Amino acid sequence: MDLQMDYADLCMMVLEKFGDVPNIPLSARMLLEYAEVRLAKIGMNLEKSPLASGKTVGWDALFETSAAKILAVREERTGETVGIIWPFHPAAAWMCARKKAETAGEVTAAADALIKEGHRDRDGLFDNPVHPGQLSTEILAMTVPFLAWAGKISGEKRYFDEAVRQFKGYAARLYDPAARLWHPGYLTAEAAAAVTFRPTDQSILSPVLSLPEPGVLAGCWGRGEGYALFALSELIFELPEGPEKEELIRMRVDMLDSLLPLQDPNGMWHQVLNDWGSYPETSGTAWILYAVGRGLKKGTVDREKFLPPYLCGLAGMARYLAYDGSIFNGSVTCICPGGRGTAVDFAFAKWLKDEPHTVAPVLLSLQQAVQNECAKGLIPSLSEVLNQFTGE
């Protein structure tokens, strides 16, 4: 990696490769466009260019172009791993919450429709309407931030209440207190009956699992954990101050704390989080770094404890990015590989180059690093980080 490049340079390399690619699937494009417009807004707010390469970016023009593209097409689109639809374009809702778009009426109407008509399971959790009863942490990423943005836009507590209810309900079903990790989803009883678990499904670093129901997918998928962290981080950022926000901050700290021992010496987290026998995986690593970066920015995680792993992770992830914006070691797109979603199934699902759902978390984690370096002065430059954390 060229040491005359910084976090923003990496962002632009990735964005230039993927931002206007027509065959990016719709399920990946939603968060990619969110990452694009958020990056533009960050660039607009900086006093000087964050690009070490000397290139120039018209941040205002990038924002206007991105916003026009997003606001022109806001129809419902499906997610990555489930049949549920996005209730509203996340970038359009976020822009409205930042007073950058006049879509308040549309956002709150879509949020009301989600609360009243969204398909739910027996516990009132949003589920997969194509396969009723199926849960996925991706559903959290599709619904919880949107409800939080609706709460921010309207000032109405009921949207925040539903977002918190969904996150806590999902945690009760999918968070594993023994492994201290999330499982990525839940299969219906009919589907679970066909699952046969094998002794080799136990992960190496956390052999003890706590599966409250047979339908919980046993594998601890890095990207699945990332979806839960993304949902929680956006909710924390928007939620008004109070005891509930403090509780959620503690939940995120606990989640991140449990991930620190699972980071490998090169800074990466793996496809199966608690099994280094699986490959280092870029999207899960990026989602974790995004959550840690947001915590560092707001001072809600311990700097002494989390800063070194954060910097090591940025260095590690940067080494999986190429000069042309290519991204290596992205997880295959599937919540339940092998039809069972066990640790072995996830581990044997091959990594992909330029896997579309890897792009958004990489962009979000890098732009958070841009903020932490250029706006807050919290971290050193990428060149310094790469020199400090050389890997094995």
Model-derived segments and their meaning:
Residues 11-19, 34, 85-98, 125-142, ...:
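Carbohydrate-binding/catalytic loop surfaces
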Residues 32-33, 143-153, 229-236:
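Alpha-helical scaffold elements that line and support the substrate/ligand-binding pocket
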Residues 227-273:
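Oxyanion-binding "anion nests"
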Residues 46, 150-161, 235-246, 295-304:
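Inter-helical turn/loop segments and adjacent helix faces that build the functional surface
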Residues 53-57, 61-65, 69-210:
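Extended ligand-binding groove/face enriched in aromatic
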Residues 177-182, 261-272, 302, 311, ...:
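Catalytic cores of carbohydrate-active enzymes
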Residues 2-30, 37-91, 97-110, 134, ...:
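CBM-like carbohydrate-recognition segments
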